[in-house]
Amino acid sequence: MSSQVVGIEPLYIKAEPASPDSPKGSSETETEPPVALAPGPAPTRCLPGHKEEEDGEGAGPGEQGGGKLVLSSLPKRLCLVCGDVASGYHYGVASCEACKAFFKRTIQGSIEYSCPASNECEITKRRRKACQACRFTKCLRVGMLKEGVRLDRVRGGRQKYKRRPEVDPLPFPGPFPAGPLAVAGGPRKTAAPVNALVSHLLVVEPEKLYAMPDPAGPDGHLPAVATLCDLFDREIVVTISWAKSIPGFSSLSLSDQMSVLQSVWMEVLVLGVAQRSLPLQDELAFAEDLVLDEEGARAAGLGELGAALLQLVRRLQALRLEREEYVLLKALALANSDSVHIEDAEAVEQLREALHEALLEYEAGRAGPGGGAERRRAGRLLLTLPLLRQTAGKVLAHFYGVKLEGKVPMHKLFLEMLEAMMD
């Protein structure tokens, strides 16, 4: 994969309101802090409009609940940062509640962001959560004043999480001591000790993304496929950022990092779909707001992919996959690259062995004293990787066919990764 992969200007799927100086740039990434998986608003089980919630924002002046978009006849002032409906003047400029809260949180928390692309990500309502670095830069460029944020006041009950200014990668290689961890999502039945690597993987797990299907799009399966292409594009860059936070990955040469990502990115994305679908019954959660059953996937233009993905989901459901096991399996899928372009195969093997050892350590703590139970469980988890690769191959082949048809616009990063895998 060429060095241009993370800095390519995308094609645009739809025009969106934005300020005149909104930059046109590359695919963006979401680097919001990880949050606990918790019950949220009911997901969309078709492709209507999506009511976005972000940092306490509900339906805006032009929206109503229930996934339907209702436009007001009143003239609207637009947010100069993302183009959403402005709720007023905040910190000196017309802005929406989401961008106001984002700017305030950034200043009060002294948060520093980095763009994994080219620092020219487009910031719109649809993609404002994709790259926080470029979003903050846009806030400053349109005139938001840092001096307007009081540093002695922080949000109270509305605060959903606290963000760490920076997550430092763990040293690698090295020991991963076990220790207690409060696991998000409620008490565990078995209080297994979690080693430092697992704790780190839980911390750097990306925040959930939304598909945000276009409510104004035409009927038929093409808008659904376009929505998924846009979602995958954003997930790719999130995956790039996530991979760089895995201990040992950043120690690889840049060429090897790209070769690894190029060969397994779809496996990481497919595993994410499967993990989000675990609580569901015969349904696939492509995103928090896009859930399809097998028939719905077929109607959305995915052919038999729904059946293939559900086969993987049921395999993981039978194993009762835990979140700690998921983050380890996801990292192992990354390190399980079979790319022939890897220059330092020994370094990749070292990363894979460290992750395998962490999985064994976690399963040993989960199983308690006894012989062999942890290795049997770890073995069953690892045996899902071939099915994951097979399923990802089917998804790749399907979307490469969509690319060849030329009926659905795709962002260039997604195109680049597709072509690299299929060449």
UniProtKB/Swiss-Prot annotation:
Changing residue 418 to A: Loss of coactivation activity. Loss of increased response to coactivator activity. This is Steroid hormone receptor ERR1. Changing residue 413 to A: Loss of coactivation activity. Loss of increased response to coactivator. Changing residue 343 to A: No effect on binding L3 of PPARGC1A. It comes from Homo sapiens (Human). The modification Phosphoserine is found at residues 19, 22. Changing residue 338 to A: Almost complete loss of interaction to L2 or to L3 of PPARGC1A. Changing residue 22 to D: Represses transactivation activity in response to coactivator as for wild type. Changing residue 403 to R: Decrease in sumoylation. No effect on transcriptional activity. Complete loss of sumoylation. Induction: Induced by PGC1alpha in a number of specific cell types including heart, kidney and muscle. GO terms for cellular component: chromatin; cytoplasm; fibrillar center; intercellular bridge; microtubule cytoskeleton; nucleoplasm; nucleus.
